[in-house]
């Protein structure tokens, strides 16, 4: 494998892995504040899935000869990055729905082509990740739908979250 290609793969896969791990944080803050036990279980499962996605991707990058410790050190030192969408605060419960529906939806659009990328370990990880992200996207949609069918305050909260997240999500493309 050409050295430049290997370096680019490590950079891309590690950034993707970092994004999956850091992506747990905004929604993870809401696990203890979920309005029902069912919503808590759904959110807990989603956050666990995102952690698993990060681990799949770190494992794919490790096949290229870099260690997980090196990748994490690069993140901590600022040499490596993660998706900036995860820097936006989650101010209310509706943000969890918008993240699932729109952020995960945008991620799916960007990630499905990676299922056919030229590096096998990454492509195989992406097949599983995209299937799980599709489930997360549906959960977010259903959460927003429930809010939009709720009280006037719930509808307003859903609209406010959608308005706040719209442009950051569009910037994912």
Residue ranges and their predicted role:
Residues 1-14, 75-100, 117, 150-154, ...:
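Acidic/His metal-coordination segments adjacent to aromatic residues that form catalytic metal sites
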Residues 2-5, 23-45, 106-122:
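Helix-loop segments that flank and shape redox-cofactor active sites
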Residues 3, 41, 58, 109-111, ...:
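His/Met- and acidic-residue-enriched segments that coordinate or traffic transition-metal cofactors
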Residues 5-16, 34-53, 96, 121-133:
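Alpha-helical scaffold segments that form or flank carboxylate-/histidine-based iron centers
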Residues 46-74, 140-147:
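Conserved alpha-helical segments that form or flank metal/cofactor-binding pockets of metalloenzymes
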Residues 84-139:
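Internal, conserved structured core segments that host functional sites
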Residues 121-173:
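A contiguous pocket-lining binding segment that forms or flanks enzyme active sites
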């Amino acid at each position: 494998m050409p050295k430049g290609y290997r370096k680019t793969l490590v950079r891309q896969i590690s950034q993707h892995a970092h994004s999956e791990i850091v992506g747990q944080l905004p929604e993870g803050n809401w696990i203890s504040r979920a309005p029902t036990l069912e919503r808590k279980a759904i959110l807990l499962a989603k956050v666990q899935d995102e952690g698993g996605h990060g681990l799949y991707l770190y494992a794919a990058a490790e096949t290229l000869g870099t260690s997980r410790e090196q990748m994490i050190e690069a993140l901590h030192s600022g040499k490596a990055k993660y998706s900036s969408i995860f820097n936006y605060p989650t101010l209310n419960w509706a943000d969890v729905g918008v993240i699932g529906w729109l952020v995960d939806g945008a991620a799916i659009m960007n990630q499905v082509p990676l299922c056919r990328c030229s590096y096998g370990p990454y492509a195989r990880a992406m097949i599983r990740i995209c299937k799980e992200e599709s489930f997360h996207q549906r959960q977010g949609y259903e959460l927003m739908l429930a809010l939009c069918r709720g009280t006037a305050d719930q509808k307003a909260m859903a609209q406010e979250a959608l308005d706040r997240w719209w442009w950051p999500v569009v910037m994912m493309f």
